[in-house]
Amino acid sequence: MINPLTLYDSATETRRKNIYEDVTGDLLGYCVITIKYFYNFDDAYIDLGGSSTRWVSNDPDYRITADMTFVSGHDDHVKVTVRCVPLGEGSSIVKTYTLSVYPDGELKG
């Protein structure tokens, strides 16, 4: 299941980013979230494993980072924080999502 999430700059409304996330893995072992980010037809991928952060972006104007952590006391919930940091002028955009992961690997949120 793929759900669209939207990350946008509310100050200008001109740079709109669509984030799609998909979950694979096993809650008893590991959980991997892949976020696919589109901007100006350039795509980048953020892969999250455990609490580590990895990012790749071919958009020269932004650095995209993301972090995933399991919600304390709830092994079936993850918190994803996505940061969009402009390398020039402008404000950083930070969005946090709490998502539920079910044993079949499907993401709800």
What are these regions (language model features)?
Residues 2-109:
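Mature secreted bioactive peptide module from preproproteins
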